[in-house]
């Protein structure tokens, strides 16, 4: 059985870069959207991904995640494309990627005692572009929206964050960390929450065969390098529906490995429509 093709948005970020590296190392095919492809390939080479693997298993689309056309090019696999094992040149209809894994988010820098963020609405804008891209694809290929073809629609996994829910239904941030955490991160948290709300709407839900929202703890420690975290076995997992995993932090490499193992390898079925919290300590 051929392995599915995975689309990555925000793959130059630590968590998703680690997930992409695992994906390529284990023989999956991937399509990644990147504003600067050379930056992405340089990061992957630091993960010991060789040029042959990059050439044979990865297609990079140059563009911005806020551009619906660039996103559309990332999601739609043309017949016979080398990195798509599910289609053949004889098939007249493109297919969609099996999974979309997105780690889009603003980048912050300290200015005095505050964090300043380069794109405070990037999650909202990227989510709007993703939905627009899929709306255009489904308008061109309405067969994807037939009830019988729901499994041909992509499974979406997005990285959000602990503490983004303004109603705080579940206190998923340790008590001693809450004031500082919300004070420093209120801008990206508001943006992540808008993203979650957009994906919860009925039309958006119909565009995917499921949505998995991953809410990691603080990502202020660790980098994207495989093996630099505590390891998959050390990750504590909870859900908003039952009980979140309350903790201080989790390395980026561990988030990427968890998404790879649970979503790419195992298919993600256990976590569909869940808001999954991840911590290590």
Swiss-Prot record:
Lineage of source species: Eukaryota, Fungi, Dikarya, Ascomycota, Pezizomycotina
Source superkingdom: Eukaryota
InterPro entries referenced in this protein's UniProt entry, alphabetically: NAD(P)-bd_dom_sf (IPR036291)
Keywords tagged on the record: Oxidoreductase
Known EC number: 1.-.-.-
Enzyme class: oxidoreductase
Name this protein carries in UniProt: Oxidase pynE
Factors inducing expression: Expression is positively regulated by the cluster-specific transcription factor pynR.
Example GO molecular function: oxidoreductase activity
TM regions (residue ranges): none
Pathway: Secondary metabolite biosynthesis
Annotated PANTHER family: FLAVIN REDUCTASE-RELATED, UPF0659 PROTEIN YMR090W
Family: Belongs to the avfA family.
Example GO BP: secondary metabolic process
Described function: Oxidase; part of the gene cluster that mediates the biosynthesis of pyranonigrins, a family of antioxidative compounds. The first step of pyranonigrins biosynthesis is performed by the hybrid PKS-NRPS synthetase that condenses 6 malonyl-CoA units to an acetyl starter unit, to form a 1,3,5-trioxotetradecane-6,8-dienyl-ACP. The enoyl reductase (ER) domain of pynA is likely to be functional during the first two rounds of polyketide chain extension, to generate the saturated C-C bonds of the alkyl side chain. PynA subsequently forms the amide bond between the acyl chain and L-serine.
Outcome of gene disruption: Leads to a reduced accumulation of pyranonigrin E.
Gene source species: Aspergillus niger (strain ATCC MYA-4892 / CBS 513.88 / FGSC A1513)
């Amino acid at each position: 059985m051929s392995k599915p093709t995975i689309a990555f948005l925000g793959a130059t970020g630590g968590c998703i870069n680690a997930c992409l590296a695992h994906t390529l190392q284990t023989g999956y095919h991937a399509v990644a959207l990147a504003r600067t492809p050379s930056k992405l390939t340089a990061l992957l080479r630091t993960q010991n991904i060789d040029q042959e693997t990059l050439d044979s298993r990865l297609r990079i689309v140059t563009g911005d995640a806020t551009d619906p056309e660039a996103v559309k090019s990332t999601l739609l696999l043309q017949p016979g494309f080398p990195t798509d094992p599910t289609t053949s040149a004889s098939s007249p209809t493109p297919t969609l990627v099996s999974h979309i894994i997105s780690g889009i988010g603003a980048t912050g820098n300290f200015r005095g005692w505050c964090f300043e963020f380069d794109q405070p609405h990037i999650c909202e804008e990227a989510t709007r572009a993703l939905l627009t891209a899929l709306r255009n694809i489904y308008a061109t290929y309405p067969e994807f929206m037939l009830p019988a073809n729901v499994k041909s629609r992509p499974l979406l996994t997005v990285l959000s964050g602990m503490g983004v829910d303004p109603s705080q239904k579940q206190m998923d941030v340790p008590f001693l960390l809450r004031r500082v955490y919300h004070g420093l991160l209120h801008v990206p948290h508001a943006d992540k929450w808008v993203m979650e709300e957009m994906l919860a709407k009925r039309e958006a839900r119909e565009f995917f065969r499921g949505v998995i929202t991953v809410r990691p703890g603080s990502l202020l420690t660790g980098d994207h390098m495989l093996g630099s975290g505590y390891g998959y076995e050390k990750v504590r997992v909870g859900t908003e529906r039952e009980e979140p995993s309350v903790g201080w932090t989790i390395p980026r490499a561990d988030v990427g490995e968890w998404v790879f193992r649970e979503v790419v390898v195992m298919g993600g079925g256990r976590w569909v429509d869940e808001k999954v919290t991840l911590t290590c300590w």
